[in-house]
UniProtKB/Swiss-Prot annotation:
Chemical reaction(s) catalysed: aklanonate + S-adenosyl-L-methionine = methyl aklanonate + S-adenosyl-L-homocysteine
Functional note: Involved in the biosynthesis of aklavinone which is an important precursor common to the formation of the clinically significant anthracyclines such as carminomycin, daunorubicin (daunomycin), rhodomycin, aclacinomycin T (aklavin) and aclacinomycin A (aclarubicin). These compounds are aromatic polyketide antibiotics that exhibit high cytotoxicity and are widely applied in the chemotherapy of a variety of cancers. Catalyzes the methyl esterification of aklanonic acid to yield aklanonic acid methyl ester.
Molecular function as annotated in GO: methyltransferase activity
InterPro entries: Methyltranfer_dom, SAM-dependent_MTases_sf
Record's keyword annotation contains Plastid: no
Homology family: Belongs to the methyltransferase superfamily. DnrC family.
Pathway assigned to this chain's UniProt record: Antibiotic biosynthesis; daunorubicin biosynthesis; Antibiotic biosynthesis; carminomycin biosynthesis; Antibiotic biosynthesis; rhodomycin biosynthesis; Antibiotic biosynthesis; aclacinomycin biosynthesis
Name of the top EC class for this enzyme: transferase
Assembly description: Homodimer.
A Pfam cross-reference name: Methyltransf_31
Protein name (record): Aklanonic acid methyltransferase DnrC
């Protein structure tokens, strides 16, 4: 699959899900965004770029940190995400936020115009993520920082999902995925620089960074019910699996997921699952 086709699929998936993204009774991206902002330590007056900002899981906490003297620029390739983030920014009365539809792989932004670049589960979706990281170094000012999150890739588990989900998704169903989204393709793309901390360290150093820190921490994902989680899964990256499945397989997968997740739920039917997340920070070398 060409990069242009891949990006079109990503854009369409997130654009179509923007109105319900990170909603529907499931908490994950927002609880992951807050600690990413905390470890990146934005301070009053700083200029922050949020790549793949979505509906603002990092954007709004960062805007609070930098205050009215600073600014936060959110970019996303999906117009619907930018529209939803603009609505919320207006509702919050925030004037230190700018939002633009932009390809985060090749951001059209001035050199040395930011103090901090952050991305929550967004860098990993870029076809040339390593090249993008090098370009971000160029738009960071002296002493600027980068902070991003990614899944913790482990052998034998379904990428992007907690290990508990691996036995719930039959391998045969994955054949319906676009080639670049099948687990083996994801492993080839990411494991070369993301799986091991030492590979990630070397990659970031080659891209122009220093003081690299890699920390794996669980982020608690909560859902009101198994059904709520399955509905929510249509609003994030897993949407690409759902929309490529024939109806019969869609029905089968939903039933398998609900049944399996019900076994993990508490007495009220609610779910709480710890998701392994990798937090990465670094400083630009120039």
């Amino acid at each position: 699959m060409q990069d242009s086709s891949y990006k079109e699929q990503v854009t369409q998936a997130f654009d179509q899900s923007s109105s319900t993204y990170d909603r529907l009774g499931v908490e994950f991206f927002t609880p992951m965004g807050r600690p990413l902002v905390e470890i990146s330590e934005p301070v009053t007056g700083e200029r922050v770029l949020d790549i793949g900002c979505g509906r603002g899981a990092c954007l709004f906490p960062a805007a609070e940190k930098v205050g009215p003297q600073g600014r936060v620029h959110g970019i996303d390739i999906a117009p619907g995400m930018i529209e939803e983030a603009r609505k919320e920014a207006a509702e919050r009365g925030l004037r230190n936020i700018a939002l633009d539809v932009m390809d985060a792989e090749t951001p059209e932004l001035p050199a040395r115009s930011f103090d901090l670049v952050m991305g929550s589960y967004s860098v990993i979706f870029l076809p040339d993520a390593v090249g993008a990281l090098a370009r971000y170094a160029g738009i960071l000012d002296h002493g600027g920082r980068i902070a991003f999150t990614s899944p913790v890739f482990r052998a034998g588990t379904f990428p992007f999902l907690p290990p508990e989900f691996t036995p719930l998704i039959p391998q045969a169903l994955l054949e319906h995925l676009p080639e670049q989204w099948r687990p083996e393709a994801l492993v080839r793309r990411f494991n070369s620089w993301l799986e091991r901390a030492e590979d990630l360290l070397r990659t970031l150093e080659r891209c122009g960074y220093t003081s690299v820190a890699v920390t794996d921490e669980p982020v608690r994902m909560t859902a009101l019910s198994s059904e709520a989680w399955v509905d929510w899964s249509h609003t994030q990256g897993m949407r690409l699996l759902w929309q490529n499945l024939p109806q019969a397989q869609r029905t089968e997968l939903r039933a398998r997921l609900v049944e399996g997740l019900d076994k993990l739920s508490d007495a009220t039917g609610a779910l709480a699952i710890d998701v392994p997340v990798r937090f990465v920070t670094a400083r630009v070398a120039h």
